[in-house]
Every structure is written in C-alpha cells, then in structure tokens.
Amino acid sequence: MTITAAMVKELRQKTGAGMLDCKKALEETNGDIEAAATLLREKGIAKAAKKADRIAAEGLTSVVVKGNEAVLFELNSETDFVAKNKQFTDLIEELGNLFIESNVASVEEALSLKGASGKTVEEVILGATATIGEKISLRRVVRVKKTDAQGFGAYKHMGGRISVLTVLESANEELAKDLAMHITVFNPQFLSRKDVNQSTIEVETKVISEQIANDESLQGKPEKILNGILQGRLNKVLQEIVLLDQGFVKDPSITVANYLKSANNNILSYVRLEVGEGIEKKVDDFAAEVMAQVNK
C-alpha cells in the first residue's frame, strides 16, 4: 500500500512521533493508522493517543438539573463561530428547558418531542440550520435520575465545552460539584477498577510488554522482575484512568476514594460529555475557515 504524506501527517498529529517513525510504522501496518499508533506506543515512541486529539466537531454541551432528574445533551455545529452565536446558545437553553420538563432519554425521543410552538425538536433544529447557515445536529441525550437521599453535582466548563454530572450516595452539593470539576479535568474512563473492561487490560498489557521487550536496559532481567515491572506500569495506567484511583484535584496527595471516605460518602455514577468527543472531522486552515464564514 502506498503511504501518503496525508497519512503520515495524521499519524504525527495523533501520536506526536517523528515523520520517519510514522512512515515506518505505517509501512509495517500496511497503512492502518490506528494499528500504527499502537505500534509506536509499543516501541515507546509515542504516548497513548487521547480522545481529545480526535475532537474536531464544534458546538456545545449542557447539563440541566431539576429535583431528582437531570439531562445532559450535546448540540453540534460545523464551526466554533456558530457555537458562540447567540442564536445557537439560545437554542441550547431552549432545548435544555424542554428536555428537563419531559421524559426524553435519547436522541430519537428528543427529536420527536414537541415544544410550545407545536414544532418538534427536529423541526426546530432544521429551522436553525436554515437560519444560521450551518448544519446543526443533536448528537447525544442522557437522562439521569436519583432518589431524595442521593445528591447531584453539575458542572459546565468553558460555557459548555464540557458538561459533567455526578451522583452521590448521600446529598452533599459541595462534594458533588468538586467531583464534577475533578472529572472535567482528569476525564476518567472508569469509575472503579471493577468497571475496567478486559479489552482495556489486554491492550495496555500488550503495549507495556512490548515496551519492556524493546528496552535494552531490561534485557536479561529475571522474568519475576520483568513481571513486577509490567504490573507496576499497568497499575500506574489504571491509576490514571480509574476515577477512584486518581489523585483528587484539590489535594493530589490523596485519592478520590480516600477523599470520599473522609467525607463518609460514595459516588454512584457520573456522566461526562465533551464537545465533538470521538468525532473525526477535517480540520480546515484557520484563515480559510474565516474567509468561508465571511463569504457566506
């Protein structure tokens, strides 16, 4: 397979590795960019690609809480110019108020929901698309419920670039919001170690094993020592991706688990939405993007 400059560029942006390393990795994986990124990690040339590296779609997220129910959702636009537009932010507020007063728990249910005007949300969004001049789309809707004894913590970062909701075993508004802020910053993939799926363990174990095998300073070491190194590195990875194992944002010397224990509380669940998370999108030249807006 022919390895193009565009493929090398994409892999460099994803991993931060050098041009030649990226080209070689692509050649070894027959042009498979994801496989090449993993190969670079195994060789210790690149760190794990983060989800943020792939965030390109624009728009806003929002979280709305009323009593024992909360709704989080994401509304996408094509550019951040539109996401900052008052008409777009007003639409976010309108949808949030409509969703929290209903029972919608999915995009499909939300799109068919009718507002005070008699129009469905889908019709309202199509109208906004026509008026604003960019495609507007509702991507995610999540509904969360709690009991009277439990507590919500909601936090919106940068006006809605990220929205987080936490659910605590016992109501504690300050604690719940602190945890929501922590989750905003550290973006844990799992709540506890028991939630970590086997595929994640297998991938990380393979990457670490290859790193150890390629480390000349570890050549000839006893298998027991190498296994200890592997487990130590795997444990460090888990500490980075598991919420309860992470150092607490306000006091990194203690884990989130210990912080909760000191407050005699537990976190039951959380939801974190970040604009464009996981969406692949062509990134245009900034100047060209500006001119595209001017010429509309």
Swiss-Prot record:
Annotated spans, Involved in Mg(2+) ion dislocation from EF-Tu: 79-82
One Pfam family, short name: EF_TS
Gene Ontology MF terms: translation elongation factor activity
Subcellular location: Cytoplasm
Keywords: Cytoplasm, Elongation factor, Protein biosynthesis
Primary site of residence: cytoplasm
One of the record's GO cellular component terms: cytoplasm
Family per record: Belongs to the EF-Ts family.
Function: Associates with the EF-Tu.GDP complex and induces the exchange of GDP to GTP. It remains bound to the aminoacyl-tRNA.EF-Tu.GTP complex up to the GTP hydrolysis stage on the ribosome.
Protein known as: Elongation factor Ts
